[in-house]
Amino acid sequence: MGVPKFYRWISERYPCLSEVVKEHQIPEFDNLYLDMNGIIHQCSHPNDDDVHFRISDDKIFTDIFHYLEVLFRIIKPRKVFFMAVDGVAPRAKMNQQRGRRFRSAKEAEDKIKKAIEKGETLPTEARFDSNCITPGTEFMARLHEHLKYFVNMKISTDKSWQGVTIYFSGHETPGEGEHKIMEFIRSEKAKPDHDPNTRHCLYGLDADLIMLGLTSHEAHFSLLREEVRFGGKKTQRVCAPEETTFHLLHLSLMREYIDYEFSALKEKITFKYDIEKIIDDWILMGFLVGNDFIPHLPHLHINHDALPLLYGTYIAILPELGGYINESGHLNLPRFERYLVKLSDFDREHFSEVFVDLKWFESKVGNKYLNEAAGAAAEEAKNCKEKRKPKGQENSLSWAALDKSEGEGVASRDNFEDETEDDDLFETEFRQYKRTYYMTKMGVDVVSDEFLANQAACYVQAIQWILHYYYHGVQSWSWYYPYHYAPFLSDIRSISTLKIHFELGKPFKPFEQLLAVLPSASKNLLPTCYQHLMTSEDSPIIEYYPPDFKTDLNGKQQEWEAVVLIPFIDETRLLEAMETCNHSLKKEERKRNQHSECLMCWYDRDTEFTYSSPWPEKFPAIERCCTRYKMISLDAWRVDINKNKITRVDQKALYFCGFPTLKHIKHKFFLKKSGVQVFQQSSRGENLMLEISVNAEPDELRIENIASAVLGKAVFVNWPHLEEARVVAVSDGETKFYIEEPPGTQKVYLGKTAPPSKVIQLTDKEQSNWTKEIQGISEQYLRRKGIIINETSAVVYAQLLTGRKYQISQNGEVRLEKQWSKQILPFVYQTIVKDIRAFDSRFSNIKTLDDLFPPRTMVFMLGTPYYGCTGEVQDSGDLITEGRIRVVFSIPCEPNLDALIQNQHKYSIKYNPGYVLAGRLGVSGYLVSRFTGSIFIGRGSRRNPHGDHKANVGLNLKFNKKNEEVPGYTKKVGNEWMYSSAAEQLLAEYIERAPELFSYIAKNSQEDVFYEDDIWPGENENGAEKVQEIITWLKGHPVSTLSRSSCDLHILDAAIVEKIEEEVEKCKQRKSNKKVRVTVKPHLMYRPLEQQHGVIPDRDAEFRLFDRVVNVRESFSVPVGLRGTVIGIKGASREADVLFEVLFDEEFPGGLTIRCSPGRGYRLPTSALVNLSHGSRCETGNQKLTAIVKPQPSVSHCSAAPSGHLGGLNHSPQSPFLPTQVPTKGDDEFCNIWQSLQGAGKTQHLQPTVQEKGAVLPQEISQVTEGHKSGFTDHSVRHQQRKHDSQRKFKEEYKSPKAECQSQKLSSKQTSGGSARCSIKLLKRNESPGTSEAQKVVTSYPNAVHKPPSGIENFLASLNLSKENEAQLPHHGEPPDEADLSPQSFAMKGTRMLKEILKIDSPDTRDSKNDMKKSDNEATVSSRRDERGVSAHPKPTCHMNKPHGTNEFQNVASVDSVCWPGQMPPVSTPVTELSRICSLVGMPQPDFSFLRTTQTMTVCQVKLSNGLLVHGPQCHSESEAKERAALFALQQLGSLGVSFPLPPPIFTNYPPAVPPGAVPPVFTQPTANIMPSSSHLFGSVSWRPPVPVAGNAFHYPSYPGTMPLAGGVPGGVHSQFIPLQVTKKRVANRKNFENKEAQSSQATPLQTNKPGSSEATKMTPQESPPASSSSSQAAQPVSSHVETASQGHVGSQPRSAPSSSKRKSRKLAVNFSVSKPSE
């Protein structure tokens, strides 16, 4: 157990000691040592409080294996991996083990009794007894065999284990695990060839490992341990190492902090100041507060500042000692005695506080203790006075002589006598106080001098034994400290002449230790023949196994710190009692009862044999085992006690990356109570603060000089935990220098080479951001690291090192080059370190392509086709010279998730705002908010509180400060909390259990803390019992065990994950896995190599939910090449820390359960994945039916969003998507021309569903998202540059270039006009071949309004585009060029207006019965383009100027609609319309409740947030009642004027004279998916109310009656994110098509819907369109046209229905790929 509270105290006093382990920046270690018992306990009984918990042995073994794999993977030792399990301990340790096991057995028994008393039914299987983790038990024997199997398996199958020597010291090897490790380290150091720069990492949970590590005096030594959380709610331990946060404690920093702690001695001592000797004495002082071998000295507690007292005393006394106390493990007794004498002043000081309190108490009430003490010591006091009398008289006479008068002399004498009497009384009381301690604690009758001398000798002997144990190993197996308590410091005297000698003896055998440490409750862990010795009354040692025992806190606070008062085992009696039973041992038991050697294993490729499995049913045999081993004798590592070698640390040596030091930056240090927050709370004690000294010359701090010194260079940031970074910009708050280099370039400029740079002046906003950055960095350094950075003159912007990647030069050479993050982070200049010599051991033997891609090597394709496929390199000798590699790729079958993506809203958990829950539960929203969080109830009443203890009776479903939620119950959307039906049920149950609690808090909402007696004031009410009942209910409820997740985590709900698993299983049944052989350029392949860990395989890939991915990391928990689906994205403040939750296609060992089947989930970083879906998007140019989710940082840095941002799309709480950005002005004309060409002659199908609310998010969106939301980069232009760079890179390959792909996207299919056919290629205007995408984004074309149209423009304007040749419009991701109105667009607009007036080429024709039906709503073509590259959808030319009812914020139909005689579209249901109206006018969703009448009829009640309450008629079913009630509500709304339908504009082609200004969004944050999607027509409603956009027409949508009628498509068919694109499976006859279109358009009647009308007929199945089709208009923004407020509804002339017999039927199909030109 080590030293209680020591780890927390030391971490808070020295704040920079520890850092959270980040796998991508872990330092390199040569040796990794594991103290295994912590892992065994963690994996076998993670939650001792749960009496229902059961676990099987195979699960324990599997978890232990996985834990070892993860630790090995994190640290990646280069030379030695040492696993040490606790063997038989020295007798000194057994006493502590015995007490701990007795306590744990009793606690387990008590918990089981309480559970049974509560009526709980416990499992029939036996619970896991943690006491079985003791050498000699059957469990440990089985574990030993399985660990040997595991070592052999990993060495034989895992490349990363094959270059390392493995040591396995099991439970059969005597000694504690950590001390066996230290024996090995000492023996290695004693070798003549020992490398002093060996880098050690020791894993373990014990706090005394800090001391053990320091005894090695090694310069590069770190401790790895799980994060320890102090304070707050006790949470269940997590078994999975992936879920665990690991901390790395650096002893290199600990050494420097100790140096600072005792730096005052440098000026005081006369002998040499030696930090190694100071560290030895520091270790000795740590023993005085107690550890596993001796109790703490009385009243010396760490949490009562015992350690600062020890340090202060040491600093005061050391100058007088003439040398150090601890001489390499040998105690210098004379110096130690003088130190203890000085320290003993503490005893008197502590008692003086007690004495003063006792005297005061006696003066008030009389005190029996003082009277008895005075009486008992009267004789001793009298003798003491008599001895002092002559001296007292002499003093009195001398005082009298000095006084001028006799009276004064008498007064002085009286005062002196009083003081002497007080001193005598104090000493008497002090002796009596200590005497009472010894009599009561140690049970002695007479506290004699001999007793005290024996106490002192035993204690000093204990200190010396521990020093030997830490420095030299076990010096005596049989010695132990024979008391439960330590003596007073003032009684440890006369020790300088003690002769201390130890007999080595021999360790207990395993069964002897078991009988010595186990309680009778664990008797079954012993062989049967010994069990009666623990239970039988006739047993000669029965008194050593008391069923009940007492514990004594002895000044401690926690029960686990208490002294367990059980008798010490008499070794002789124990062995004699066992002797009579030994003959009954079985053969297997005899084998267990012996010691064995340590195992040394290594890989040998020439050795091959079959290693049989210790459990064939669970673990397979190792068919090709390549492990060799050697037995290491028990005393092989024993080093002579006089040859303990101390490593001398070379202060001028190279800096070893990952082993921090404070020496690189000048600073001052001092102790101060600064409240540094290392753990969850601010520290209460002193912190050793560091203050950076800025002594630079003014010229050095000029921004020009700083820029020339660091710009483009590699520096180290984040002092003292240095990380390498590349500087890309510097700024002093007014000026900014930055590197100007081609996109994608990350060059480090060495020497005096100056990078190409530019300088700009910061705007006011940028200056403000600069100041905020400094404030944030300063606060972080001060609050977490205890570092004061002082005034900042410059901020450095840099990219952190992410790893190294093999780069291939043109001549075929291979180099390992550093890779830098794309994310740019700010660092203050005075904390960066430059020009240091750093040791870099990362060398590579790979120099050529042959080395990098030898035959039979596994690779992954990063080009298209076959993106992400696994391949095997073939013999490529004939192609290497040409720079190509021959590879055979496996092409597996991939599941089709498109339909699931479209219908995901059906399976998502629905969340409601708090007021909805409040309305349903009949309570206020305040109560919902309070009870789902935390509520504290104190004891007593507000007027008379009883203590400070407060109980939390909240449900703890949300955590604002920690930004955490409980999935399935709560969801945070923006700043609003949403709640599921499960949370509603839980609250309802709570209200039923404690209605008076809810009632009281509702009346006293202004209070923060409530009190028991105020809530339950009745005489018969016991508030404490009520609170305890509530707490017991809360702890027993399943919700208390649910895990929290960050609000930044975007996830798919469990129901969707289940559907994904079903699709994957369907795909497996097809078993299609073809192979292709291709030749590939080497830079398009990724080979999994350890040197490339941390490097993202494809930096252009963007990850979205539902994306298909493949693991490309070797020696990982997930098998390399295993495919999966992204089901969650966890954002982080740093790019490298982003994690993806992946559901893999197969179960694998070590897999997690993340809302999925057991063993199929895992969390991986971007560097471990290749995104298969990204490859598909690149290959086809088609956007998948989902929105981009760019990982969100927890804290964004300097957002690059424009100030005029209006917000974007909002989604439901479970929706993982980011808002789109606001459209920008001036990028519409190119789109309109293109869409008019695409859409002319195209029938507009179906009213777009609300699911398709403009959430068209092509892959390039995330680039802007990155800058706007997450702060990963500054400007979207840079992203466009990067995209263009990636296009240029792909052009070089044999695969389809991205640029070509883009041009294909923008090229139309062949069209025909009349009988003649024309091929048209549409080019971007003013585009030169060399123009980069970034330049296109920012270029504004000159205004060319007055140029006359050219012939080609007239030709385009008059073209009739064939419907058969209509082209799809894929969502290309590049934003169009911003342009003013051009001649082309004017020509097109004029032509369109003329055609509309003359009704030429109207697309509003109707196909035959099998054709798709036209939507009522003709949404307008976008006059804007989304900044992120959202492409508008095609629209017929003649409908370009129709009224607009759709924009990006509201996706509803326009007033203008088309209906066909005799065939009316189905009605959108009243419930859907009411939900839509509420959303669009900013009202919360309606609340529906049902009432049952006596006639078993159902009445629905609709309640709106504006107070409107509507009752529907009586109906036979709930669904009918709900619809009728919603219809009534809609009629009420119409009469009240709640909805605001506005008429369409008259002159839609002309912009307003004064464009309206930008209006901010009504809701600043996304709201929730309040209502479930309608099951027949629509998905979720649009969550953002309509927002007017500058320069655009704007009006609210209509309610039923003015709403156009919807097409009858089955619910859930459409994607709620991207409209489906409809293409033809076969080409229809094109003859006379234009003439038919003209006839049908003239014959089509138009109807204007009146408000309140809802007449329509339902479509028959034959009339309904195919379920897979969709409108292509769903995401069109509003055109910028005038809408006059006084304008009425404009109707169109009726048209006759076309004859379906005149045209051929067409079949439409959904096609998600780019149309081929041949079509």
Curated annotation (Swiss-Prot):
The lineage of its organism: Eukaryota, Metazoa, Chordata, Craniata, Vertebrata. Residues 1268-1317, 1397-1445, 1634-1719 are annotated as: Disordered. Found in a mRNP complex with UPF1, UPF2, UPF3B and XRN1. Associates with alpha and beta tubulins. Interacts with DIS3L2. Interacts with ZC3HAV1 in an RNA-dependent manner. Interacts with ZFP36L1. Interacts with TRIM71 (via NHL repeats) in an RNA-dependent manner. Interacts with YTHDC2 (via ANK repeats). Interacts with DHX34; the interaction is RNA-independent. Residues 1661-1680 have a biased composition (Low complexity). Keywords: Cytoplasm, DNA-binding, Exonuclease, Hydrolase, Nuclease, Phosphoprotein, RNA-binding. GO terms for molecular function: 5'-3' RNA exonuclease activity; G-quadruplex DNA binding; G-quadruplex RNA binding. GO terms for cellular component: cytoplasm; P-body. The gene is Xrn1. CDD domains: PIN_XRN1-2-like. One of its GO terms (biological process) is histone mRNA catabolic process. It is found in: Cytoplasm. It comes from Mus musculus. Expressed in heart, brain (spinal cord, dorsal root and superior cervical ganglia, neurons of the cerebrum and brain stem), peripheral nerve fibers in the skin and intestine, spleen, lung, liver, skeletal muscle, kidney and testis. This is 5'-3' exoribonuclease 1. Its main location: cytoplasm. Pfam families: SH3_12, XRN1_D1, XRN1_D2_D3, XRN_M, XRN_N. The modification Phosphoserine is found at residue 1382. Its EC number is 3.1.13.-. The keyword Isomerase does not apply.
